[in-house]
């Protein structure tokens, strides 16, 4: 039992995999690099690594302090999980168990649950024996350790297990019953550091205690902190991101249904007018968009996309008449996947569009310089081109695989099932399962609805009434800005705008990266309604949007509720609660950290009140929003979806790297060495190598040995009187 535990490295990936091997769910370990910064999110406990020799030297200076803070009461000590470390090299497992078994919001699994129930009320020494005699813990512990080298018998006498144990040591800092405790298995009693302040978290006090300990051990030298390491036991971020994505995707569906319900309630006569055309137009649009899962009709596409062909800083010149629904399908410009569809038509002559190469050549963009792209953009050529995503084509085979995955994810993301049964006036097309917002009559109704509500919008628009058709076409020329959301090839809903509120997931490094355009759902709707480069792409306009201002801060923490009259409100308000209710949090499927996650929701609501986002004149309640406000909210939701999907992928990739590093760490290279030596022997090279190494060792060993052996006999000979007579 005393020689079966191996020494573990201080690595967050190793501790994360060790926690999983214990059977614990929803927990991971992260490394803390800065003690000055406040910890973000809930923390279960800290694991502190230090050099035991330095700690023993500094402990003599503060012996009275340790005695004063030690908890001697047996009832208090036995009520918590504090175990003496009786097995050498088991301090890593002791530190993890001291954090996990003293936390009530963690799914411990069967192994640790039995351990906690069995050792309840035991003394620290008995708990230490229970840990040392648990084969499941020892097996999981040793599975992540480096294989120990096989020492020669004469060299093993100089090494002791106690000396190896004292090299580096792990201790835990855990909050228990409102007080900060330091649990060190090599000390007789736990250390009570007292309660933390009312206006601070327990992590703030723990950071101060650790900084004082580091300064005491290093005698105030700030550049010796490399001998210490700090890790935090936190909830699994994958569970959090998956829960947020579940809520965000549900809210995206709710916002899309709100757009549909807005048409059904406010414009029922237009639904009857276009009811006969709804069954005919999808058949006409098949040649233009053969493989596109959300192809728009050719008649309405040029009406909005050709309206905006300016540089983004000038007003729209000329008229943009709204074409009828019987336009030939050869004018279709909105095709999501150019490789799967062919543009066999010629651009209409009245529009000032410069002729380009064919689509299959022009979109490939073999060797076009950035200067040529800017010139084309200034000339208005880029506005008429087929909208494709950046880096659509590449010479790398992995990019093609990512493209196919993105198309599959996009087609699956825009298909959803309606909550209620289809009404007679419903616009949803049940045959193909597409979003009814993208149907032709819905687009016409949203366009007319927007034209009626333009005077109430605070966003400056450039409106030009055409003399031919008599209906105004809206176009807002702005520069397309890159998204502050992280760029990721796996996100099928990456939006062109950022979040409406400060998301904790964004970093300056991610914000500097360019991203792909918005998702097909919002991009097609915004192109038809507001032009290809509408003002919704601007982050400042999104920030002052009414729907985003009201629902943005809670869009990722609580589900939205759509009433029958079109009122959109947070689900917690309909239940009569404040902010997001615990039932909403539990529906996200987060395990082990429900109370901590609820605390985050309260913090989001409080920060919203402090920042002045809540208007004092109007209470936070359900309201009706215009189509443009709903589209802005939809872009906000999709930006958050892209953000969380990127972060989720990062966590998944991080786990893969943890496993790869663990395999490299624990791999036994003895078989490879034996095979290599046998191959050298077969080639006749082993004998020469052995002779060379033996000769070198003899020279070094003999010279050093003679020096030590000659000194002692010389001293003894000089002390004898008969030797002096001979001289």
UniProtKB/Swiss-Prot annotation:
Where does this chain carry the motif Arg-finger motif?
56-60
The short sequence motif called HBM-like motif sits at 363-366
> Which PROSITE patterns does the entry link to?
UCH_DOMAIN, ULD
| Enzyme's top EC category | hydrolase
- Give positions of region: Disordered: 273-351, 372-435, 462-522, 573-622, 702-727
* Record text about domains: Possesses 2 overlapping nuclear localization sequences (NLS), a classic bipartite NLS and a non-classical PY-NLS. The classical NLS probably mediates import via the importin alpha/beta system while the PY-NLS mediates nuclear import via the transportin system. The positively charged C-terminal tail stabilizes the interaction with nucleosomes/chromatosomes through interaction with the DNA backbone. Binding of ASXL1 just upstream of the positively charged C-terminal tail may stabilize its orientation to align the PR-DUB with its H2AK118ub1 substrate.
This protein is called Ubiquitin carboxyl-terminal hydrolase BAP1
Q: Which family does it belong to?
A: Belongs to the peptidase C12 family. BAP1 subfamily.
Q: Where does this protein reside within or beyond the cell?
A: Cytoplasm; Nucleus; Chromosome
> Which UniProt keywords are listed?
Chromatin regulator, Chromosome, Coiled coil, Cytoplasm, Developmental protein, Differentiation, Hydrolase, Nucleus, Phosphoprotein, Protease, Thiol protease, Ubl conjugation, Ubl conjugation pathway
Please tell me whether the keyword Phosphoprotein is annotated for this protein: yes
CDD domains given for it?
Answer: Peptidase_C12_UCH37_BAP1
User: In chain numbering, where does the site feature Important for enzyme activity fall?
Assistant: 184
Q: What is its main location?
A: cytoplasm
Q: Where is this region: Interaction with YY1?
A: 640-684
């Amino acid at each position: 039992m005393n020689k079966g535990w191996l020494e573990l490295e201080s690595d967050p990936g190793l501790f994360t995999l060790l926690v999983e091997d214990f059977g614990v769910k929803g927990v991971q370990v992260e490394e803390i690099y800065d003690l000055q910064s406040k910890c973000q999110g809930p923390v279960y406990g800290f694991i502190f690594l230090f050099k035991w020799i330095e700690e023993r030297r500094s402990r003599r200076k503060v012996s009275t302090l340790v005695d004063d803070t030690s908890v001697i009461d047996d009832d208090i000590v036995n009520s918590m999980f504090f175990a003496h470390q009786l097995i050498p090299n088991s301090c890593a497992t002791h530190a993890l168990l001291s954090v996990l078994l003293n936390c009530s919001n963690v799914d411990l699994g069967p192994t640790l649950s039995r351990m906690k129930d069995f050792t309840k009320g035991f003394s620290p020494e008995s708990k230490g024996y229970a840990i040392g005699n648990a084969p499941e813990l020892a097996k999981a512990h040793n599975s992540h350790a480096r294989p120990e080298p096989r020492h020669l018998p004469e060299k093993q006498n100089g090494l002791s297990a106690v000396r190896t144990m004292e090299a580096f040591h792990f201790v835990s800092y855990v909050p228990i019953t409102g007080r900060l405790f330091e649990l060190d298995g090599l000390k007789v009693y736990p250390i009570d550091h007292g309660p933390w302040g009312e206006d601070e978290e327990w992590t703030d006090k723990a950071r101060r205690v650790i900084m004082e300990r580091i300064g005491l051990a290093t005698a105030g030298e700030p550049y010796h902190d490399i001998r210490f390491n700090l890790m935090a036991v936190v909830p699994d971020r994958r569970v959090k991101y998956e829960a947020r994505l579940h809520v965000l995707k549900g809210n995206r569906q709710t916002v899309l249904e709100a757009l549909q319900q807005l048409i059904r309630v406010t414009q029922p006569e237009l639904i009857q007018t276009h009811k006969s055309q709804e069954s005919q137009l999808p058949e006409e649009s098949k040649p233009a968009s053969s493989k596109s899962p959300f192809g728009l009709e050719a008649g309405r596409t040029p009406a909005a996309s050709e309206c905006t062909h300016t540089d983004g800083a000038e007003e729209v010149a000329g008229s943009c008449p709204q074409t009828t629904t019987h336009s030939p399908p050869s004018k279709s410009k909105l095709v999501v996947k150019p490789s799967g569809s062919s543009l066999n038509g010629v651009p209409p002559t009245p529009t000032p569009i410069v002729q380009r190469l064919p689509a299959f050549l022009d979109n490939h963009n073999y060797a076009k310089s950035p200067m040529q792209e800017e010139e084309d953009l200034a000339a208005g050529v880029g506005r008429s081109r087929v909208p494709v995503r950046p880096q659509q084509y590449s010479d790398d085979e992995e990019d093609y695989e990512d493209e196919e995955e993105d198309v599959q994810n996009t087609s699956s993301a825009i298909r959803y099932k309606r909550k209620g049964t289809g009404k007679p006036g419903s616009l949803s097309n049940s045959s193909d399962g597409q979003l009814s917002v993208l149907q032709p009559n819905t687009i016409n109704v949203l366009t007319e609805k927007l034209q009626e509500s333009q005077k109430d919008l605070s966003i400056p628009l450039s409106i030009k009434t055409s003399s031919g058709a008599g209906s105004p076409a809206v176009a807002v020329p702005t520069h397309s800005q890159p998204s502050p959301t992280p760029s990721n090839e796996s996100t099928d809903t990456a939006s062109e705008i950022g979040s409406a509120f400060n998301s904790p997931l964004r970093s300056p490094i991610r914000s500097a990266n360019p991203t792909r355009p918005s998702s097909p759902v919002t991009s097609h709707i915004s192109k038809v309604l507001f032009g290809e480069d509408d003002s919704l792409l601007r982050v400042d306009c999104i920030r002052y949007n009414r729907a985003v201002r009201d629902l943005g801060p809670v869009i990722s923490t609580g589900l939205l509720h759509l009433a029958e009259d079109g009122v959109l409100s947070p689900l917690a308000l309909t239940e009569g609660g404040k902010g997001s209710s615990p039932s909403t949090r539990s529906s996200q499927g987060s395990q082990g950290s429900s109370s901590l996650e609820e605390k985050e929701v309260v913090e989001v609501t409080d920060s919203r009140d402090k920042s002045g986002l809540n208007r004092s004149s109007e209470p936070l309640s359900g309201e009706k929003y215009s189509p443009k406000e709903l589209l802005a909210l939809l872009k906000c939701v999709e930006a958050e979806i892209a953000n969380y999907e990127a972060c989720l992928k990062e966590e998944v990739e991080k786990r893969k790297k943890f496993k790869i590093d663990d395999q490299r760490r624990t791999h036994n290279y003895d078989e490879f060495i034996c095979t290599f030596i046998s191959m050298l022997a077969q080639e006749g090279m082993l004998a020469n190598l052995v002779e060379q190494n033996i000769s070198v060792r003899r020279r070094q060993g003999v010279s050093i040995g003679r020096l030590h052996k000659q000194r002692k006999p010389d001293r003894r000979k000089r002390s004898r009187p008969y030797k002096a007579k001979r001289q």
